């Protein structure tokens, strides 16, 4: 599948469109969406629109260069590894609130800066599979 139109599904709360050939995704007409899995596509942009209900986002193995999560205060799980982002800011989300045991997966060689919410303590960073998963030059900063 190379295109997906879910604009008529305004009550949609879960969408799994993983492992396709999508290059973009528009969920701007799905304000009730709480869980999105679009892993393993070639997506370079996601249009979230004004919706802010998202709690889980899995967008690993795509071509995303940016991800604006500032309006997703309820987002508690993010899998965005293997994309092309240089900066990732999760400071406005609920990631790290303790709801998920592994709330953040953001392994990518391109990542230079990771912003976390002040008070969230990193318990571990795994680099056992590949030393480039969390690049040694990635700066981790905290925001209030």
Language-model regions, residue ranges each:
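LRR N-terminal entry segment and analogous cap-like coil->beta motifs
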Residues: 1-4, 9
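Canonical leucine-rich repeat
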Residues: 4, 25-27, 46, 67, ...
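Short, solvent-exposed linear patches
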Residues: 8-13, 29-34, 50-55, 71-76, ...
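N-terminal capping/linker segments that flank leucine-rich repeat
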Residues: 8-10, 29, 92-94, 110-144
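Conserved hydrophobic beta-strand positions in leucine-rich repeat
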Residues: 13-17, 34-38, 55-59, 78-80, ...
């Amino acid at each position: 599948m190379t295109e997906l139109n879910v604009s008529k599904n305004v009550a949609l709360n879960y969408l799994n469109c993983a492992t396709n050939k999508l290059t973009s995704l528009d969920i701007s007409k799905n304000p009730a969406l709480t869980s999105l899995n679009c892993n393993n596509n070639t997506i370079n942009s996601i249009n979230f629109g004004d919706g802010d209900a998202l709690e889980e986002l899995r967008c690993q193995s795509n071509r995303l260069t940016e991800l604006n999560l500032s309006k997703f205060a309820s987002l508690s799980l993010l899998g965005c590894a293997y994309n092309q982002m240089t900066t990732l800011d999760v400071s406005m989300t609920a990631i790290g609130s303790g709801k998920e045991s592994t709330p953040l997966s953001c392994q990518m060689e391109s990542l230079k800066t990771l912003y976390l919410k002040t008070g969230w303590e990193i318990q571990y960073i795994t680099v056992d599979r590949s030393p480039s998963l969390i690049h040694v030059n990635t700066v981790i900063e905290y925001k209030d």
